[in-house]
Each structure stands twice: as C-alpha cells, then as structure tokens.
C-alpha cells in the first residue's frame, strides 16, 4: 500500500527552531525576520524573548550563514533551521560568488545533518525588489516560517514512520 507523508502546520509547539539572519542589508533582513516570527507566533511557536522554543543568531552577511547554520544543526537542539539574507546585485561579480557559496553551503548543511534548512536568502537585482519581497508587496519571511513548520513536522512524521518499520 502506498504511503503518503505530509507535514502539518499544527502542533508547532513541539518544534525547536533556529533562525540565522544576515545583518548585511538589515533593512531587508529585519523585515524578513519580522514576517517569519509573525508566522511562527500565529501558528503557536513561542517567539517571546525568553522562549525555549526559538533562537535567533545574527551573522555579518549571507556568506557566513552556512557555518552558523551547520553549528546549530549539529547541536541536536533544533528540528529545523531558517536562514534569512538579502544579496543585492552590484557592479562587480561579488554577488555571484556570495550567492553561489551561500546557497551551496546552506544546502549541504541540510543534506549532511538531516536537519531541514529553509533557504530564505533573497537574491535580487535592486534594493527595491528586495524590499518588495520583504514587506512592501508581500513578506517572504512569512513563507519561510511556513516552510519551516511544514518541514519540521514532515521530518518528525518520516522519522516515526521509518523507525516503526
């Protein structure tokens, strides 16, 4: 019989979540974090300053996201890690290097640790595009929060199903 596995957006109180935020372009990343925390709170995650369920780590920029994400994922304390950043194209190839290394690094953390890592790094050509994605038109931080809830739940379902068989 075919099995179907899906994550849920309920029972979020059971998840331990880490959010790693790049400080560079904090006008954008601060808004992403706000949207993400709003989503998590509305789904039952304790986002208060004395929360035992959520931790937020700030890093200098998107390039530093993978190492801190890996450290948190390896700690065994979190069911899911969310990364938030904003890399905006400039006149030099720096954008391409940062985006490539950050995305590869973040993806490898998830594969190597088995902890879902949500890729919440905006890659845009202009600051205006980044701001539109961080709150002017919509806030993708909310979407990243939902992805974290779904993946954290799904991994729990999969672990239970595979350990039972």
UniProtKB/Swiss-Prot annotation:
Q: Which residues form a coiled coil?
A: none
What catalytic activity does the UniProt entry give for this protein? (2S)-2-hydroxy-3-oxobutyl phosphate + 5-amino-6-(D-ribitylamino)uracil = 6,7-dimethyl-8-(1-D-ribityl)lumazine + phosphate + 2 H2O + H(+)
Q: Does the keyword Transferase apply?
A: yes
Q: What is this enzyme's EC?
A: 2.5.1.78
Q: Which Pfam families match?
A: DMRL_synthase
Q: Which residues does the annotation say bind (2S)-2-hydroxy-3-oxobutyl phosphate? A: 91-92, 133
Q: Which residues form the active site?
A: 94 (proton donor)
Keyword annotations: Riboflavin biosynthesis, Transferase
Give GO terms: molecular function aspect only: 6,7-dimethyl-8-ribityllumazine synthase activity
Please give the pathway this protein is involved in: Cofactor biosynthesis; riboflavin biosynthesis; riboflavin from 2-hydroxy-3-oxobutyl phosphate and 5-amino-6-(D-ribitylamino)uracil: step 1/2
State where 5-amino-6-(D-ribitylamino)uracil binds: 24, 62-64, 86-88, 119
Q: Which NCBIfam families match?
A: lumazine-synth
Query: What does the similarity note say?
Result: Belongs to the DMRL synthase family.
What is the documented function of this protein? Catalyzes the formation of 6,7-dimethyl-8-ribityllumazine by condensation of 5-amino-6-(D-ribitylamino)uracil with 3,4-dihydroxy-2-butanone 4-phosphate. This is the penultimate step in the biosynthesis of riboflavin.
Listed name of the protein: 6,7-dimethyl-8-ribityllumazine synthase
The lineage is: Bacteria, Bacillati, Cyanobacteriota, Cyanophyceae, Synechococcales
């Amino acid at each position: 019989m075919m099995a179907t596995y899906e994550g849920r957006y309920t029972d979020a109180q059971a998840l331990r979540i880490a959010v790693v935020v790049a400080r560079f372009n904090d006008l954008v990343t601060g808004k992403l974090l706000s949207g993400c925390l709003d989503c998590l709170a509305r789904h039952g995650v304790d986002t208060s300053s004395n929360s035992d369920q959520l931790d937020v780590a700030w890093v200098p920029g998107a390039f530093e996201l993978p190492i801190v994400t890996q450290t948190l994922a390896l700690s065994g304390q979190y069911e899911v890690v969310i990364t938030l950043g904003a890399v905006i194209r400039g006149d030099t190839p720096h954008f391409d290097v940062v985006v490539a290394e950050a995305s590869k690094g973040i993806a490898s953390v998830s594969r190597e640790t088995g902890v879902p890592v949500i890729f919440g790094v905006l890659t845009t050509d202009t600051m205006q595009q980044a701001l539109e994605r961080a709150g002017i038109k919509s806030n993708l931080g909310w979407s990243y929060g939902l992805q974290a809830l779904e993946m954290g739940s799904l991994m729990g379902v999969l672990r239970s199903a595979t350990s039972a068989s």
